[in-house]
């Protein structure tokens, strides 16, 4: 077993970052995104699947050119290679748990 406190994870940009390869060689990487309204990553893709669980707030996602709205309780499953971006909207922060099905974080910004 490997135990990690959120406060001990690096906070990069808008996310606490749990990179599996650096945390007991876990087979996944997990990011807790805290985005202010208007924030979010531009178009990018990963060579593995990603699952995003929205915990708080609202956002707008674009996946392969299609736009979707999401809010607390919604889940997005983004397949390997799909071009995607998202942005927090509304008056409150967007908080989501992003699970990358890889022990290493790999992202191609487009």
Task: Label the model's feature ranges.
Residues 33, 63, 75-77, 97, ...:
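Anionic, Ser/Thr-rich low-complexity intrinsically disordered regions
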Residues 1-28, 109-110:
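A short, N-terminal "cap"/entry segment at the start of jelly-roll beta-barrel domains
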Residues 58-60, 67, 83, 93:
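Structural motif
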Residues 15, 30-46:
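Conserved short histidine dyad/triad with adjacent acidic residue
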Residues 66-81:
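Short acidic-glycine-tyrosine-enriched beta hairpin
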Residues 34-35, 46-61:
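Short, conserved beta-strand element in jelly-roll/cupin
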Residues 20-22, 40-46, 87-89, 108-109:
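Short histidine-centered beta-strand/loop micro-motifs
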Residues 80-106:
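Ligand-binding loop in jelly-roll beta-barrel domains
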